[in-house]
């Protein structure tokens, strides 16, 4: 293990959310890191600031590429790169072993008590919450998270303790080779239709992941979720609970249901401070009050997963509850962008806006369930304001497979804008368009297609017109998607005359 950690690893796609934290962890552990990427980014800048040589752009000639890889022991390639990518082919021609991220993770996490946090939704927030709790408890964990977390200084944390928190993705079988001491499954739904042909194949993948838990380990699951229940059934367990082990692994469930081992009741959002509050029960006994700055019932479920997991790692529930109160969220998870207080205002007012104002929130939601939960969280704190949603669909395959589910996801919105599909790794060979979604949405009636180039100008015009009405109680505007939609909020505020978040 020590030899592996001092290796020289060259990362292809080093600036991506999947590989950049692995590079940081390897570097912090005493290893040597180099890499390449197709484009510059803040993640690349962070690694360069730590002395990592990174080439940006097209693959160089054979001699230059060989010099670039001089001294490397292994090449780790992003899952986004095909096997015939020139740099993968060239690395193999040089005799270097090439590993995919999923193949490298078991080596990186060897020797740790691995906590693998999986699920179709909620992985990043749950991983971030758990890492913050374990750090506050003195366990000094190592962590790899799929989102930037300001309280942790980024998307990776290199600790000196024996616990490794890993956000574990099902895409491309990324979690298939892990051997966790604790596996967390937040929920299971059909996602990534480009690799999973149906919901059954997703459940099978999660069941295989659950079987990887080490003997004597723990499987922490949301017992309320039908997809999780189906996975447990596939594992041979007839229902969620805490009385039977699966393959010598204790199953610990959480949720809102009366039978859950960890349960939240009396969930409310208080109007005065927008805090989410609940009472937490363990085995039917009240253990304390949960207070979160992050909104929504789904955030309460994430917190329950953290409570269950941290307790198994020796952290007192009371201490976990105290730390969770301080959690401020992960990037692009109901993230505040800024306020604009109407046509007469060009300065903004910082952390709070009154009637007639615009508040912009950005969220990574790109699946119908995520859209629905984010809108429900927004409704809980809207206080009479209109909720406007701006969706950039992400990938043609997801859009096609889940089109009807998307159409039913907007009932908590007052107005919906759908812009052009973000292709990501795909090409448009399905003949679908964002207009196909607009035609299917029946609620709300105010649903529009706006092309990407025209989006910010159209939003700015509509916001000005709406907020010019003295009767307007204001707008809570959500930008949703996993692509470039995150740029829309700042650009909209700039177009309105204010660009600084409070």
Swiss-Prot record:
Q: Does the keyword Cell division apply?
A: yes
Subcellular location, record wording:
Cytoplasm
**Annotated GO MF terms:** ATP binding; UDP-N-acetylmuramate-L-alanine ligase activity
One cellular component term (GO) for this entry is: cytoplasm
Catalysed reactions listed for this entry: UDP-N-acetyl-alpha-D-muramate + L-alanine + ATP = UDP-N-acetyl-alpha-D-muramoyl-L-alanine + ADP + phosphate + H(+)
What job does the chain carry out? Cell wall formation.
User: Does Kinase show up as a keyword for this record?
Assistant: no
The residues that the entry says bind ATP are: 119-125
Give the top-level enzyme category.
ligase
The pathway to which it is assigned is:
Cell wall biogenesis; peptidoglycan biosynthesis
Biological-process GO terms, alphabetical:
cell division; cell wall organization; peptidoglycan biosynthetic process; regulation of cell shape
Q: Which NCBIfam families match?
A: murC (TIGR01082)
* Family named by the database record: Belongs to the MurCDEF family.
Q: Under which name does UniProt file this protein?
A: UDP-N-acetylmuramate--L-alanine ligase
Q: Which domain of life is it from?
A: Bacteria
Q: What is its EC number?
A: 6.3.2.8
């Amino acid at each position: 293990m020590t030899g592996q950690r001092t290796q020289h690893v060259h990362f292809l796609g080093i600036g991506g959310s999947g590989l950049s934290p692995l590079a940081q962890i390897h570097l912090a552990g005493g290893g040597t890191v180099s890499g390449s990427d197709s484009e510059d980014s803040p993640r690349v800048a962070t690694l360069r600031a730590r002395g990592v040589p990174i080439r940006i752009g097209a693959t160089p000639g054979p001699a230059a590429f060989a010099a670039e890889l001089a001294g490397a022991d292994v090449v780790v390639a992003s899952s986004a790169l095909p096997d015939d990518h020139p740099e993968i082919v060239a690395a193999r021609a040089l005799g270097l072993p090439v590993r995919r991220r999923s193949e490298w993770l078991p080596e990186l996490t060897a020797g740790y008590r691995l906590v693998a946090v999986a699920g179709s939704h909620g992985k990043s927030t749950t991983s971030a919450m758990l890492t913050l709790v374990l750090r506050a408890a003195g366990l000094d964990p190592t962590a790899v998270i799929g989102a930037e977390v300001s309280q942790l200084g980024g998307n990776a944390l290199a600790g000196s303790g024996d616990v490794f928190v890993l956000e574990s993705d099902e895409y491309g079988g990324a979690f298939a080779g892990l051997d966790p001491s604790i596996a967390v499954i937040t929920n299971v739904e059909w996602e990534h239709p480009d690799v999973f042909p149906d919901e059954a194949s997703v459940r099978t993948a999660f069941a295989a992941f659950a079987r990887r838990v080490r003997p004597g380990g723990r499987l922490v699951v949301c017992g309320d979720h039908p997809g999780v229940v189906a996975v447990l059934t596939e594992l041979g367990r007839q229902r969620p609970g805490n009385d039977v082990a699966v393959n010598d692994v204790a199953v610990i469930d959480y949720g809102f249901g009366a039978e859950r081992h960890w349960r939240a009741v009396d969930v409310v959002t208080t109007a005065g401070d927008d805090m989410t509050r609940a009472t937490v029960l363990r085995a039917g006994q009240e253990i304390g009050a949960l207070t979160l700055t992050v909104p929504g019932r789904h955030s309460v479920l994430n917190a329950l997963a953290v409570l269950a997991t941290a307790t198994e790692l020796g952290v007192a529930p009371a201490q976990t509850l105290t730390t969770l109160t301080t959690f401020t969220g992960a990037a692009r998870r109901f993230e505040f962008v800024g306020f604009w207080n109407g046509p007469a205002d060009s300065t903004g007012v910082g952390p709070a806006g009154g009637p007639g104002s615009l508040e912009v929130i950005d969220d990574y939601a790109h699946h119908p369930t995520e859209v629905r939960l984010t809108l429900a969280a927004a409704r809980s704190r809207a206080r009479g304001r209109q909720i406007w949603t701006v969706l950039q669909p992400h990938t043609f395959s997801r859009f096609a497979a889940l089109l009807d589910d998307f159409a039913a996801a907007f009932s908590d919105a007052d107005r919906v804008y759908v812009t052009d599909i973000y292709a990501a790794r795909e090409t448009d060979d399905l003949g679908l368009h964002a207009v196909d979604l607009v035609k299917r949405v029946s609620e709300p009636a105010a649903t529009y297609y706006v092309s990407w180039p025209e989006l910010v100008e159209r939003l700015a015009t509509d916001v000005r017109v709406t907020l010019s009405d003295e009767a307007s109680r204001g707008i809570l505007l959500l930008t949703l998607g996993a692509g470039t939609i995150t740029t829309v909020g700042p650009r909209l505020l700039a177009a309105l005359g204010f660009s600084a978040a409070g």
